[in-house]
Design a protein with these regions (language model features):
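Alpha-helical transmembrane segments in multi-pass membrane proteins
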Residues: 1-23
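Juxtamembrane helix-loop-helix connectors linking adjacent transmembrane helices
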Residues: 1-2, 27-98, 114, 187, ...
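Hydrophobic alpha-helical transmembrane segments
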Residues: 5, 40-45, 86, 90, ...
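Hydrophobic residues within alpha-helical transmembrane segments
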Residues: 6, 45-46, 95, 124-128, ...
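Hydrophobic core of alpha-helical transmembrane segments in multi-pass integral membrane proteins
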Residues: 11-19, 47-55, 201-226
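Membrane-interface helix/loop boundary segments of multi-pass membrane proteins
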Residues: 99-124, 151-158
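Functionally important transmembrane alpha-helices
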Residues: 126, 138-196
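Membrane-interface helix caps and helix-loop-helix hairpins in membrane proteins
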Residues: 131-137
Length: 228
């Protein structure tokens, strides 16, 4: 547990070092302002919309490469296994939301703020963010989440919202694991066996249907983060 905390803390130190190296203004690199209700709701809607859209590459990869995808999703379960919920929430949800956002949407993002289009900073930070998680199979959906968080920062100039997005995204699997921790081991083994053998094509189609709601939620969220 301490190793994870120190590792995440090192990211924050590197972010601060990067800002100092490039002589960036700390307040500009890590902008924080009082959040508004509209922007907060918009952030939640954008997270839901992004999550639904990431179902498309995730379901395709799960259908084509079931064993690899099953292995890629075990890290959170292994990390939180046996830990009290409070500690698991701190390690998996809170510290990454703060320290990883400082590193990728803070230090790294600020290096490219001088360019005319913010999309260079958004895309580069998202690609590095996806690669940072060390799994080829998780790269695309993770990078897509990184794009959404970078966009939030670029449009709101407030790290509160991309940190909130990151926190919610990590909290969902953590909460689900806690809720299912009481399931009998036989049932868990059966579920893992089903995951390792893949999903039906009809399930992929269902995911695509869910994902179709994503653009509407992104539009609504985008409206609110600009309205608020």
């Amino acid at each position: 547990e301490w190793g994870i905390l120190m590792y995440e803390g090192l990211l924050a130190v590197l972010a601060l070092g990067t800002v100092a190296l490039f002589r960036e203004d700390v307040k500009r690199a890590f902008p924080f302002h009082r959040p508004t209700i509209a922007k907060t709701v918009g952030t939640v809607l954008m997270w839901i919309g992004t999550l639904l859209i990431t179902m498309i590459p995730t379901s395709i990869l799960l259908y084509v490469f079931p064993e690899q995808m099953s292995g890629a999703t075990e890290s959170v379960s292994e990390l939180s296994g046996g830990l009290p919920f409070g500690i698991a929430f701190l390690l998996i949800c809170v510290t990454p939301a703060i320290f990883e956002e400082m590193a990728f949407r803070g230090g790294l993002f600020s290096c490219f703020r001088g360019f005319r289009s913010p999309w260079l900073a958004i895309l580069i930070s998202a690609v590095v963010f996806g690669a940072f998680h060390g799994s080829f199979w998780r790269f695309v959906p993770t990078a897509m989440l990184g794009i959404a968080m970078g966009y939030l920062l670029a449009e709101t100039d407030n790290m509160f919202y991309n940190m909130l997005f990151h926190l919610i995204n990590n909290a969902l699997p953590t909460l689900l694991l806690q809720l299912t921790s009481s399931v009998a081991s036989e049932q868990m083994e059966s579920a893992e066996a089903m995951a390792s053998t893949g999903i039906l094509l009809v399930t992929v189609a269902v995911y695509f249907i869910y994902a179709s709601a994503g653009p509407f939620l992104l539009y609504a969220g985008n409206y609110l983060i600009h309205k608020g």
